[in-house]
Amino acid sequence: MNAPRFLQLHRPDDAALAAEAAAGLLQPAAAVSPKFLYDALGSRLFDAITELDEYYPTRTEAGIFAAHGEAIAAAVRAATGPAPILVDVGAGDGTKAARLFARLQPRRYVAVDISVDYLRGALACLGREHPGIEMLGLGLDFSAGLALPGGVADEPALVFYPGSSIGNFAPAAARQLIADMRRSSCGGAVLLGVDLVKASSRLEAAYDDALGVTAAFNLNLLRRLNTLLGADFQLRQWQHVALFDAAQSRIEMHLQARVALQVRWAGGERRFEAGERIHTENSYKWTTAGFAALLAEAGFGAQCHWTDPAGDFAVFVAC
């Protein structure tokens, strides 16, 4: 077995992150990037969210792969040929991509996440389980664009972005990221998970569960800002809000002040009135026709998709 290789292309800069977060808090309508949700505790809380009854995307996507796995793999192989390079964007622990290994038999697995530190344990484990696959971990902040270094995917590859994460991007930004994926595939294919439009009550329940795990996930952002900025957010003074904006076809997550309060941090402060919000995340929901049009706008000429029987979720292959 070859040992996994790691390349950190993006160096997290706490000073730059702090400046970005502070600037967001000082906007007329305060907003902070959802990337601040995912510190170590936030990532564990999100893993717990995926197991909740209300949060259907993870299990529904898994059901689509179980029901249609061979057809999906055949569509990928038609574009990439046998033994493709598999580029896993936002890889995390790599478990979703690993489910593709048996059918696709990739010769190289490229796990992309913001820090290679998140990838070391996962790739060591996957390397032991799949000694015939070359393992490469890339530390890359793809939220500002996906550009792979030379030699990583220099032949037709599959770019894999599951779990409806594409919904965290506004349509124009999603189109640009998908165009980046198309270039990175080197004439291969992309495989994406897409959450579909449905009743607002189900969407809001998925982002505001009865156990309060999603609320804890959102409130943990304030804990992160306290550490990053030296701020004095009091978590009990805030509440989690999730709502569906039908006009923009997106779920929004906010943190809402329960009372009027003043927040201070190194170099800044802001007063929040009772009911005032900090916007923390969007998750756009698509129709299959709308997402197919987005793929075409990003440059893909051929595509196919599969859904669950209820039409809650879709998996797209485009080339």
Positions of predicted regions on the chain:
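N-terminal auxiliary segments of SAM/dcSAM-dependent transferases
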Residues: 1-36, 43
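Class I SAM-dependent methyltransferase SAM/SAH-binding core
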Residues: 102-145
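A short glycine-rich, Lys/Arg-flanked "PGG" loop and its adjoining helix->strand segment in the class I
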Residues: 175-187
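Class I SAM-dependent methyltransferase Rossmann-like catalytic core
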Residues: 29-76
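Conserved SAM-binding loop of SAM-dependent methyltransferases across substrates and taxa
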Residues: 93-105
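Substrate-binding/catalytic lobe of Class I Rossmann-like enzymes that use SAM or dcSAM, i.e.
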Residues: 204-284, 288, 292-298
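Conserved beta-strand signature within the Rossmann-like core of class I S-adenosyl-L-methionine
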Residues: 184-197
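Conserved class I S-adenosyl-L-methionine
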Residues: 81-92
